[in-house]
Amino acid sequence: METMPNWLMQRAFLTPDRTAIEIEEEKVTFMQLHEKVVSVCGNLTHVGVKRGQKVAVLMKNGMEMITVIHALSYVGAVAVLLNTRLSREELLWQMDDAEVICLVTDQDFEAKDIPVYSFAEVMNGPKEEAFIQEEFSLEEAMTIIYTSGTTGKPKGVILTYGNHWASAVGSSLNLGLRDDDCWLACMPMFHVGGLSLLMKNIMYGMRILLVPKYDADFIHKALQTRGVTIISVVSKMLTDLLERLGAETYPSSLRCMLLGGGPAPKPLLETCVEKGIPVYQTYGMTETSSQICTLSADYMLTKVGSAGKPLFQCQLRIEKDGVVVPAFTEGEIVVKGPNVTGGYFNREDATRETIQNGWLHTGDLGYLDEEGFLYVLDRRSDLIISGGENIYPAQIEEVLLSHPAVAEAGVVGMTDDKWGQVPAAFVVKSGEVTEEEILHFCEEKLAKYKVPKKACFLEELPRNASKKLLRRELRQLVEEM
């Protein structure tokens, strides 16, 4: 069993006085962070958290969430990170599915069968001497993060200490490391992209400027004045920043904008080139512990639309009907590497279907060019990406079909200037119901960003001979609106 020293403990020993986290004007060193974490471990032990148990974390970006995530690793518990934008029903379902023993949160939340603790309670409540892991086993689970499948039912992706370690190492081999590096973190830490920065923070000994909530004005100013060298963004954020930048440019110390959430429009990249902003486009998912492919800034314009090549220790190929296909042939993107999950929690069938001989079948379609650059054609063909959030139509359809006046339902994405895409619903009625009633019903069952922005009524939904829903025809209807 391969082990490593406890990451934060080792970092606090190596560089105790180096700044770990900055939030607004507050600075916390690695040793101070370690001491906060040890204090929380005492309370987690007091309330009965033991090694191997799962603890749900429902918190917004902040020092508190960072402390709790590290404290759970110190006592050997698995952090189940919950999306703060989900509805109460969705959160309860995920906690039940993950078999968590309690919830730590910074929000008002009540659960009948699960003890709920505020951060104030775990920080300042009664304490017992905790057994702290001084070593991590790379095979052990560290986190579970839920991701929706094409069936719409969320699956808990198990990421081990080894997965997170490999992801951070792969990123450093790709982007390089500098003593003065500072990564501005504005992605939610309940997503793997945000969480991965916490791993890099303690492994690299790199300062993080943490933004509790997305604020384009604050981020723009921080890039100009706070010595930020790297930032992770999605296209909408990049557009927001360029609007604020105007005719100016950012300091040359900003060496990387890591762009995820799908390919960026060419005019956006051309503007970045003109202003000397190095954009690195990436491709990844929860199952790969964040990025697995990156297009360096050198190829921003010559390989427009490409997600680049795999990280150093990763492999990628395109398959069609189980056979590896040549360049420029469309097929399923299949990846392999030490950062790839070993499977889904309590989903043996889904794990066997998705991971075969170590290769992860992403469900995404794409092709490689003659030089091995990846082009992603469709992120799980039915997926709607709204403001960087993944929305699966099947989950919304399931809610719609639970309405007594809905006989059939189909959901697709429609273009939106602000969010990129938003859901649009098509419904066949079985009784009297209005569009307003349908949307209100969804608001009670779904996270706000998943609620359809429009509900249209049809006599029947387009289907093929096998009665499978033809989403492409629904997309055509959306385009004709």
From Swiss-Prot:
PROSITE patterns: AMP_BINDING. Transmembrane segments: none annotated. The keyword ATP-binding applies. The keyword Nucleotide-binding applies. It catalyses: 2-succinylbenzoate + ATP + CoA = 2-succinylbenzoyl-CoA + AMP + diphosphate. It comes from the Bacteria. GO terms for biological process: menaquinone biosynthetic process. Its EC number is 6.2.1.26. Keywords: ATP-binding, Ligase, Menaquinone biosynthesis, Nucleotide-binding. InterPro entries: AMP-bd_C (IPR025110), AMP-bd_C_sf (IPR045851), AMP-binding_CS (IPR020845), AMP-dep_synth/lig_dom (IPR000873), ANL_N_sf (IPR042099), MenE (IPR010192). It holds the Pfam family AMP-binding_C. Pathway: Quinol/quinone metabolism; 1,4-dihydroxy-2-naphthoate biosynthesis; 1,4-dihydroxy-2-naphthoate from chorismate: step 5/7; Quinol/quinone metabolism; menaquinone biosynthesis. One of its GO terms (molecular function) is ATP binding. Converts 2-succinylbenzoate (OSB) to 2-succinylbenzoyl-CoA (OSB-CoA). Belongs to the ATP-dependent AMP-binding enzyme family. MenE subfamily. This is 2-succinylbenzoate--CoA ligase. It comes from Bacillus cereus (strain Q1). The lineage of its organism: Bacteria, Bacillati, Bacillota, Bacilli, Bacillales. The gene is menE.
